[in-house]
């Protein structure tokens, strides 16, 4: 497919993914690439324009990130943001100097030149600055578009070559007209049409999957989570009964989850789903184990063995579907990433399983995967399912995992989810669940002394799960949840609410 694209070069900014996402919100496809990408690779991508992201370096640092100089010979529009503008200025013969003081936060810029980026926008704008260096003399051919009290060149342009630079961050919401400016670059400067939609994405992926698979057989490990569900339905749309899904019920799922998965995929989507009831097998392996890391390893390894056993029964499988997301690719693959993560989308499958991978979601962000799921007709309760750990309730039962304890977590968690949804808070809270700490306490129920379990409620708000704050659930909602749990769930006489942020605590207790 010859789709239009804006390429974003990653120079290490904390906002680089945000630039890509903003452009996609305009209906234009965009990809984030390492700053080391060669000019000929960009040409092969059929890019309509290039954006240089910000970054923590100074252009004068010995280890400063730079780019292939041939990029400036491609004849493509370029927008440099923050460090990206400084790099352009430095490379093209302008002057970059250390600022007398680092500028961080909101600033007021004055527009001095009615370039295409600023045409029709206010002469005074609030923007978001975050820089230690600044451009003090523009390169030849560039006009100064805007200034601020502490930044003599807050924006510059060479309209003949369609090259622009802004010292501020238009991708951040604090830059009031930032979105307008980015739109002007994408549509008016680069000439994009804005026809990248989920419908187009589905059509293109269906074509690619059919081309890749031909008449061969495909396997998918279905967890019931958002990513594996959307990937499975998309692949099924492309190749139908050539796809077989394996759903391992390890007995550590939430209430009604296994039934919901089977109903949705086997009945609604008419997919080949093999359900493996492995509850006894997992509980036997977990007997007497209290260490959380050991529990994780046992559950992860056992999942592999069960999946491997089932896969071995199937003949002629050549492909494996994985729900890898674009964020996984970015975090694992860019040279500027601060943290490298390894991602195991199906629980870390054995290396000797010689399958060719199908990763239909590996160009999408999480919110786009949800939009795709909705477009494919997947029910809201799956599309909007919260993050759920691979080991499931095995790490929400602290200490040894038993059937009795799992039942307490299952029932209390179901009450929590029901009441949160009833209160209209289910889309506001990032994640909410109950935990069973390995403690009992004294209580009084029906005039009799009790010595029973405590249930903890954990609910957090977050953007990406990296940091989180405890959710301010209204007292009356908490009261209803607590009353129902102690009245409806056997062996519970106390409910507590975890009011710790991340950091210092993690979202999960184990």
Curated annotation (Swiss-Prot):
Q: Which GO terms describe its cellular component?
A: cytosol
Substrates-to-products reaction catalysed: XMP + L-glutamine + ATP + H2O = GMP + L-glutamate + AMP + diphosphate + 2 H(+)
Q: In which pathway does it act?
A: Purine metabolism; GMP biosynthesis; GMP from XMP (L-Gln route): step 1/1
Q: Where is the Glutamine amidotransferase type-1 domain?
A: 5-195
Q: Where does ATP bind?
A: 223-229
Instruction: List, for all copies, the residue spans of the domain called GMPS ATP-PPase.
Output: 196-385
Q: Does the keyword rRNA-binding apply?
A: no
| EC nos | 6.3.5.2
Query: What keyword terms does UniProt attach to this protein?
Result: ATP-binding, Glutamine amidotransferase, GMP biosynthesis, Ligase, Nucleotide-binding, Purine biosynthesis
The active site lies at 82, 169, 171
List the molecular function annotations (GO) for this entry. Answer: ATP binding; GMP synthase activity
Q: How does it assemble?
A: Homodimer.
Report the protein name in the record.
GMP synthase [glutamine-hydrolyzing]
Q: What is the lineage of its organism?
A: Bacteria, Bacillati, Bacillota, Bacilli, Bacillales
């Amino acid at each position: 497919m010859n789709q239009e694209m804006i390429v974003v070069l990653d120079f290490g900014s904390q906002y680089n993914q945000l630039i890509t996402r903003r452009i996609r919100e305009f209906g234009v496809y965009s990809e984030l690439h390492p700053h080391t990408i060669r000019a000929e690779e960009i040409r092969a991508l059929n890019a309509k324009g290039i954006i240089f992201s910000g970054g923590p370096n100074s252009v004068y640092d010995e280890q400063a990130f730079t780019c292939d100089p041939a990029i400036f010979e491609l004849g493509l529009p370029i927008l440099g943001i923050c460090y990206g503008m400084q790099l352009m200025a430095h490379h093209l013969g302008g002057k970059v100097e250390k600022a007398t003081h680092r500028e961080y936060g909101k600033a007021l810029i004055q527009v001095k030149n009615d370039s295409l980026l600023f045409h029709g926008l206010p002469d005074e704008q609030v923007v978001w600055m975050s820089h230690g260096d600044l451009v003090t003399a523009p390169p030849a051919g560039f006009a100064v578009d805007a200034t601020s009290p502490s930044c003599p060149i807050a924006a510059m342009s060479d309209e003949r070559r369609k090259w622009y630079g802004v010292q501020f961050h238009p991708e951040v919401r604090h830059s009031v007209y930032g979105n307008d400016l980015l739109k002007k670059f994408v549509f008016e400067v680069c000439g994009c049409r804005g026809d990248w939609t989920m419908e187009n994405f589905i059509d293109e992926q269906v074509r690619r999957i059919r081309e890749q698979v031909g008449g061969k057989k495909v396997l998918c490990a279905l967890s019931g989570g958002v990513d594996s569900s959307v990937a499975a339905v998309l692949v099924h749309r492309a190749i139908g009964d050539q796809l077989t899904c394996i759903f391992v019920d390890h007995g550590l799922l939430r209430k009604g989850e296994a039934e919901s998965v089977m109903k949705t995929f086997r009945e609604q989507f008419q997919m080949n789903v093999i359900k493996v009831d492995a509850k006894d097998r997992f509980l036997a392996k977990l007997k007497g184990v209290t260490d959380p890391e050991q529990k994780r390893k046992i559950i992860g390894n056992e999942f592999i063995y069960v999946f491997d056993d089932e896969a071995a029964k199937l003949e002629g499988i050549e492909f494996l579907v994985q729900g890898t997301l674009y964020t996984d690719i970015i975090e694992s693959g860019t040279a500027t990433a601060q943290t490298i993560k390894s991602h195991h989308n199906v629980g870390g499958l054995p290396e000797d399983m010689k399958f060719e991978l199908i990763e239909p979601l590996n160009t999408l962000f999480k919110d786009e995967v949800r939009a795709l799921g909705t477009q494919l007709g997947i029910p809201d309760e799956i599309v909007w399912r919260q993050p759920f750990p691979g080991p499931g309730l095995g790490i929400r039962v602290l200490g040894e995992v038993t059937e009795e304890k799992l039942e307490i977590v299952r029932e209390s968690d179901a009450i929590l989810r029901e009441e949160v949804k009833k209160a209209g808070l289910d889309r506001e809270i990032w994640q909410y669940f109950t935990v069973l700490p390995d403690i009992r306490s004294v209580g009084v129920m029906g005039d009799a002394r009790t010595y029973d379990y405590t249930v903890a409620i954990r609910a957090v708000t977050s953007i990406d799960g990296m940091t989180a704050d405890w959710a301010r659930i209204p007292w009356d909602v908490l009261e209803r949840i607590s009353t129902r749990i102690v009245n409806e769930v056997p062996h519970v006489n106390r409910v507590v609410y975890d009011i710790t942020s991340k950091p210092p605590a993690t979202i999960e207790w184990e």
